[in-house]
């Protein structure tokens, strides 16, 4: 038998007419409880809460011992934020029928609205013990939501675990526990739980996926990939499995395999910038800068306001020695985020490569100002000033770098190199000795800064002395 919408409308119209007659005292027709419920539902659907509440009160006059009508009234009172009144009605309803699950759900809503979390938790924990099957599971979900709202996240995981132990194929719980496993870090428990679920039903692709995600959380990437593959055998269009396989392969530095998995994601789902960016990252690591750039650009087209993608394109040009092309990308990135340390640093390096020293100094000074404790900014600025022949300024910046970075040895070497160029040999040798005695490993950068320094016999002698002493 099919539903007839026209007949339904005609029926409710007639019912409303009879109800209005009853309210005005002109009708003598007997109303069944179900008829009142239809009228309440009608006004509720029309979002006329006051009339719905009026209908509920009228219904209760005729059926004062109906738990379902009292619960309906309490629900409407909650909608009007009359929480205490709603609780009083629910207490009364419980006397007539304490087995209606809506009693506990609505009481919980009232307690939470009144910021009485402890009462809500106590009620639900008690109620869970009185119900079985689907109703128990519904209450456990409700309890999990309460724990979530009040940031008791381990207890959220516990609720979902209990649900899955009772109903291993519950999709909502399977989806949620994947997130909460990652959030709480309870990967070992998740592995045990999902192995049991798979033992019960080996064709549950969500259980395989969650098992894989838990392995991934423990950095057991090969095991994770195997489990994702099982999920894909069951559902070959499971795009999130391919996505996570791609991530696992990236962690294993198997970039070619990662690209294959991520390209499958693009086949199965709507294009996303994060996928194109990840593919670009893989090509970047494989030093295929043209392909990396191609995918970073695709990501950028999907999110033009993400300056980081423009920066990554610039890095590919920089790695190929295409300084001018890198500068163009960085100019665009800096228009979006001018105060990014990395953008200013790379722009300074590009300008240095192009022998545009004044611009280079400006950008590198910005980088240092933005992150004064970062070594790379100071290192690049002093190196730039040295290459440009601005030795007085280089000396000042080397001293400033030592002050800001807790006397990092690298800047003792750089200060020594600068002093040699300023013909302050005695002072330069003192700083070189101090640097060598503190950390010989940065000697390479000292020599890289100015290779002809090895033609100075005093420098060669000091280095030789420290090499002999370290043997």
PLM region spans:
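Start-of-helix register in tetratricopeptide repeats
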Residues: 34, 68, 102, 136-138, ...
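Canonical positions in the second alpha-helix
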Residues: 59, 92-93, 127, 162-163, ...
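Structural marker of alpha-solenoid helical repeat scaffolds
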Residues: 62, 95-97, 130-132, 166, ...
């Amino acid at each position: 038998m099919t539903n007839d919408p026209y007949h339904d409308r005609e029926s409710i119209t007639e019912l409303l007419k009879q109800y209005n007659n009853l309210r005005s005292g002109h009708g003598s027709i007997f109303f069944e409880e179900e008829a009142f419920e239809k009228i309440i539902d009608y006004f509720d659907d029309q979002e006329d809460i006051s009339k719905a509440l009026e209908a509920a009160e009228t219904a209760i006059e005729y059926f004062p011992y109906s738990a379902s009508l009292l619960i309906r009234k309490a629900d409407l009172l909650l909608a009007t934020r009359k929480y205490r009144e709603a609780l009083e009605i629910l207490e009364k309803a419980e006397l007539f029928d304490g087995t209606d699950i809506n009693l506990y759900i609505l009481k919980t809503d009232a307690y939470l609205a009144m910021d009485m979390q402890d009462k809500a938790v106590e009620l639900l924990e008690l109620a869970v013990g009185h119900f079985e099957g689907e109703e128990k599971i519904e209450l456990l979900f409700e309890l999990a939501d309460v724990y979530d709202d009040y940031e008791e996240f381990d207890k959220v995981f516990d609720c979902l675990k209990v649900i899955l132990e009772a109903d291993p194929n519950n999709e909502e719980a399977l989806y949620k526990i994947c997130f909460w496993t990652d959030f709480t870090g309870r990967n070992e428990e998740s592995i045990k739980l999902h192995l049991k679920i798979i033992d019960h039903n080996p064709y549950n692709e969500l259980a395989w996926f969650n098992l894989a995600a838990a392995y991934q959380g423990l950095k057991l990437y090969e095991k994770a990939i195997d489990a994702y593959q099982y999920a894909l055998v069951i559902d070959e269009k499971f795009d999130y499995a391919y996505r996570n396989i791609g991530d696992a392969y990236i962690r294993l530095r198997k970039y070619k395999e990662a690209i294959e998995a991520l390209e499958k994601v693009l086949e199965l789902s709507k294009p996303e910038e994060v996928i194109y960016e990840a593919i670009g990252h893989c090509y970047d690591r494989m030093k295929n800068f043209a392909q990396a750039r191609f995918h970073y650009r695709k990501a950028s087209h999907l999110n033009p306001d993400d300056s980081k993608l423009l920066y990554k394109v610039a890095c590919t040009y920089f790695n190929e020695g295409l300084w001018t092309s890198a500068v163009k990308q960085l100019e665009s990135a800096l228009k979006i985020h001018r105060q990014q340390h990395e953008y200013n640093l790379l722009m300074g390096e590009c300008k240095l490569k192009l022998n545009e020293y004044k611009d280079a100094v400006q950008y590198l000074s910005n980088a240092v100002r933005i992150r004064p404790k970062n070594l790379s900014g100071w290192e690049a600025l002093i190196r730039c000033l040295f290459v440009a022949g601005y030795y007085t300024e280089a000396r000042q910046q080397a001293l400033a770098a030592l002050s800001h970075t807790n006397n990092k040895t690298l800047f003792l070497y750089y200060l020594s190199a600068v002093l040699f160029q300023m013909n302050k040999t005695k002072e330069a040798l003192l700083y070189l000795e101090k640097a060598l005695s503190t950390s010989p490993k940065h000697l390479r950068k000292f020599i890289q800064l100015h290779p002809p320094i090895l033609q100075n016999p005093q420098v060669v002698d000091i280095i030789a002395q420290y090499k002999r002493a370290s043997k």
